[in-house]
UniProtKB/Swiss-Prot annotation:
It comes from the Eukaryota. GO terms for cellular component: cytosol; plasma membrane; secretory vesicle. It is found in: Cytoplasm, Cytosol. The gene is GGP1. GO terms for molecular function: gamma-glutamyl-peptidase activity; peptidase activity. GO terms for biological process: camalexin biosynthetic process; glucosinolate metabolic process; proteolysis. This is Gamma-glutamyl peptidase 1. InterPro entries: ChyE-like, Class_I_gatase-like, GATASE. SUPFAM superfamilies: Class I glutamine amidotransferase-like (SSF52317). It catalyses: an S-[(1E)-1-(hydroxyimino)-omega-(methylsulfanyl)alkyl]-L-glutathione + H2O = an S-[(1E)-1-(hydroxyimino)-omega-(methylsulfanyl)alkyl]-L-cysteinylglycine + L-glutamate; (E)-1-(glutathione-S-yl)-2-(1H-indol-3-yl)acetohydroximate + H2O = (E)-1-(glycyl-L-cystein-S-yl)-2-(1H-indol-3-yl)acetohydroximate + L-glutamate; 2-(glutathion-S-yl)-2-(1H-indol-3-yl)acetonitrile + H2O = 2-(glycyl-L-cystein-S-yl)-2-(1H-indol-3-yl)acetonitrile + L-glutamate; (Z)-1-(glutathione-S-yl)-2-phenylacetohydroximate + H2O = (Z)-1-(glycyl-L-cystein-S-yl)-2-phenylacetohydroximate + L-glutamate. It comes from Arabidopsis thaliana (Mouse-ear cress). Residues 16-213 form the Glutamine amidotransferase type-1 domain.
Amino acid sequence: MVEQKRYALFLATLDSEFVKKTYGGYHNVFVTTFGDEGEHWDSFRVVSGEFPDEKDLEKYDGFVISGSSHDAFENDDWILKLCDIVKKIDEMKKKILGICFGHQIIARVRGGTVGRAKKGPELKLGDITIVKDAITPGSYFGNEIPDSIAIIKCHQDEVLVLPETAKVLAYSKNYEVEMYSIEDHLFCIQGHPEYNKEILFEIVDRVLALGYVKQEFADAAKATMENRGADRKLWETICKNFLKGRVPTN
């Protein structure tokens, strides 16, 4: 009998009413994107202080850290505890996929610097350029490494200084670190491979209603997805290959 794979999702965000009504919560959004049949996924609402017991970390095959409206450089109790847990998982060489806030938290834990994005916030669909020389053919990217990948972006912070052992895997016009890896067990993405058009548009409408952005900014964000979408299938494949140690056949 094949042993069931177990994964833990660290949710650093609360569910919006839209996400709860449409998808049943962010747990379902992530598991639909990264999960496979027969796996067991546990969610821990770390933003609310919910964490696994340290003695239980060993039972998981991999971890995913979500995005957040909080800053990864803050020193709130839950953020400091998350950093401590991530450090322990890193020492165990367990796989961690860091997304947006998670990407920044891992950089912080490993000695990098995170701060406000120098070129300002992003809320849109954008392309990131792949550093092909940094990616080994046959790794979780497969043998056919693309020049660029489209991804939905939603952030106001960035990794300003990478940890010494990190390797940049992608960059963009405004951001030097769109994606990086550390050794074989840490893989981090500034964008949101789990987001779709509906989630982006709801976030745009919400921040506009709250007065965080102007109408022109909101219109420009939605315009980026008028005629195309994110490369979600490719992101799904890459992230699954990483988390599950798969060797692609393409």
